[in-house]
């Protein structure tokens, strides 16, 4: 009996990415390389919700890794209707969702709208030292970033970061960050179509990606330093991947080397979870951080699935994947060697 208790996880959580629902017929993606199943993505979500509800160990929460509806909804002004249809399905699960914002959130809605919507899950995070989407008086502040952290269990923390903090699509044109982002993008990408990586040395500098501002990097440093001191295990969560071996290089955060430098300098970081690259990829970097990019629901054939449940233990996390998401056992870096990070 004791051994059985020892095998039980501290907690579990669900993960799903790139639902990109729209009430539209199937069509190829932007690059014409893969089919997108717009209506079926809602069916895929329903299947995930049903399975999570039936699990013997109920997930403590669900991570929704961004791009909840597709930008194509703007063509017939159905963005709000599409979002409501997705949220209705999520609400059938009596478990909290933590939402990340991706490029398709910003194709459909302004940052101010998202801040006041159900996709703003900041209230479910710790209220101490949040990144914040509001100013000190509670009003919306377009210069802030959407980021927060929470601890579902002692010694474990999740840090959600804003990959479109610096982005022309993630900021209003009146925002100073808009000008900074657009100037940087045009400096790195001379193409007329800013979504095209043709001829670029740094192919991540396309319009559908974004960057992390110095202020957000500083905030991440503070949170991770605190977690180091508390000897916590931290999972960093974003829409955009940050490791070249965990995604197509065209899908990375603009300044991913800076972000990686921050993550790798903190022994508390054990994993980085992302979406955006629909085929999904995985790598463990030289510092022992697991970079897991999840397959996108939108490009998952009707006969398959694309979601998972992570089981969190003292020394490892075990992913039970469905369909395109593979099962994985991911051990944390040896605590004795954590101090070797620099």
Swiss-Prot record:
Segments traversing the membrane: none
Entries under CDD domains matching the protein: MPP_Nbla03831 (cd07396)
Required cofactor names: Mg(2+)
Entry-linked Gene3D superfamilies: 3.60.21.10
Keywords annotated in UniProt: Hydrolase, Metal-binding, Zinc
Binding site for Zn(2+) 2: 67, 103, 239, 276
EC number: 3.6.1.13, 3.6.1.16, 3.6.1.53
One Pfam family here: Metallophos
GO molecular function: ADP-ribose diphosphatase activity; CDP-glycerol diphosphatase activity; metal ion binding
Catalytic activity: CDP-choline + H2O = phosphocholine + CMP + 2 H(+); ADP-D-ribose + H2O = D-ribose 5-phosphate + AMP + 2 H(+); CDP-glycerol + H2O = sn-glycerol 3-phosphate + CMP + 2 H(+)
InterPro entries (UniProt xref): Calcineurin-like_PHP_ApaH, Metallo-depent_PP-like, MPP_ADPRM
Binding site for Zn(2+) 1: 18, 20, 67, 278
PANTHER family with a match to the protein in the record: MANGANESE-DEPENDENT ADP-RIBOSE_CDP-ALCOHOL DIPHOSPHATASE (PTHR16509:SF9), PTHR16509
Role of this protein: Hydrolyzes ADP-ribose, IDP-ribose, CDP-glycerol, CDP-choline and CDP-ethanolamine, but not other non-reducing ADP-sugars or CDP-glucose.
Assembly and oligomerization: Monomer.
Family: Belongs to the ADPRibase-Mn family.
Protein name per the record: Manganese-dependent ADP-ribose/CDP-alcohol diphosphatase
Lineage, highest ranks first: Eukaryota, Metazoa, Chordata, Craniata, Vertebrata
